[in-house]
Amino acid sequence: MAFLVQELANATAARGHEVHVLTGYPNWPVGKPMTPYSAWRPVSERMGGVTVHRIPFLASPNGPLWRRMLDFKSFELSVRIFGRSLERPDVIHVHVPPNEDALATAALAKYFACPFVLHVQDVQPDGAIKIGSLKSQLAIAILRRQETSVYERAAHVLALGVEMRTRILRKGVAATKVSLLPNWINAQAIAPMDRMNPLRAEWGIPEDRFVALYAGTFGRAHGTAQLIDAAEQLRMDTQVTFLLVGQGHDFEHIQRLTESRGLRNVMVREFVPRARLAELQAIADVSLVTLRSGLGNISVPSKVLGYMAAGRPVIGLLDSSSDTATLLRNAKCGVVLEPGDVVGLAREVRALAANPSLAREWGQRARKHVLDQLDAQVVLGRGVEMLETVARGQAVFQ
């Protein structure tokens, strides 16, 4: 989500505000500082109209749970220490998860006697409990208390969609305190392109192949093994290729599944640099999004906006009541199936492969919806106005 923070910071600075970002050193995906940064030396630099303060922490983006917790806790401690050296802000904005960032922000806001805005991307620890990665009742109780404290101390809370907002309200947060601010996308950076592009050529995907693309995180919450099951339904269909691109906890598992089942209609690739995202999105004839059952009001996969901005239809294996499902229905740009319906997914992919005019129509609708509702130029203005309102000590208009 670093690019969302960057774009919001730039938009805030463009309105004439002085903006400081407190963050770590660039380290994704290997967990080591990129040249010329150091893991232990804090540094400040000017990026456009924003001052970025990079502070030390123990990075571990893809390690076991205990390593990632060390990552989060070390950054929390670093924020508490180095954040106090900054000038007093009028308002602090923080993305969560990880919730440790919110704990550090709450402490910093108390130190400076200023308000902070909690921008929720995933509702945690709900997601971790749901997928089974968090089982200790003691740990859950501690995290619940911390969560309650953060919601109480935040001046305002931003949710990505109606269902996510409802889930937050059920935690006892006042309705006047929670507003909707969907994620956005730069529709100029990700725009429709020719499907026959250099990246497709590098990967050797023939022109006549219909490509079903999954691009994003292979996490426990996503249930990406469903895509392998759907591909197996179409293993004899030489027209369709499932292209799975990304990184995450289940990436190697997906590679092994593909190899063990001998699926020649599946290609698994590591994620491409952000500069090539538009090429990647353009390879698709249809794009895929998955979330495990019960996670629809906890998370809103940002990959969907990239799919839609690229002008591609979307098939989702999602809870029908989820914010993502509602987005696809409102845009009239795809199909929503229940999680686990791999037969239905195979059927819909085959149907779109046989009806390219319908695929193009849905893709055009997707692009139009992004331009009208979710383009950065549309959404960022609202986000900056909310921060300005909170900084003035006023109530955010619902």
Question: What are these language model-derived features?
Answer:
Residues 1-46, 236, 395-398:
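N-terminal subdomain of nucleotide-sugar transferases
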Residues 238-239, 243-246, 251-278:
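Nucleotide-activated donor-binding/catalytic signature segment of Leloir-type glycosyltransferases, i.e.
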Residues 344, 351, 358-372, 379:
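A short, well-ordered alpha-helix in the C-terminal region of glycosyltransferases
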